[in-house]
């Protein structure tokens, strides 16, 4: 959808603009972030023993290994690894937040999807559409059966694995929400 002056998305920055404005982190800045994360998780995160046992994760070791491999990482790969380490904790209160210009930004599609039940079958329907989005037959109430070529149920489950949430239902809820609204 093209942005127009009347569109509510008109003032939203494009991802390409955001990426172009990002300053890469120096090696020292990356090391500082990793070391701060090590202190946070190893010395302050009281649920670490529980999370290790429940989810078979070792974020302290992953951070140690990341620290040793930092020189070969792009910013994108570094941030992806940090996000993965924190998501592995499956703790909604412990997150890795991207630096500026991404901090506080959300990538958003101009519609929402919600799940509902029809008998024993879960269905996914478009439940909200941004003002000005007119793409018939797409609109409110349309059933979504696939996402990026993947059956929607599987797409939601895969997306849920990329989100914090310590049980299947929490991951499903986060996976569904973040299909169309993804914090950067």
Region roles according to the model:
Residues 1-184:
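Flexible, low-complexity junctional segments that flank or bridge functional domains
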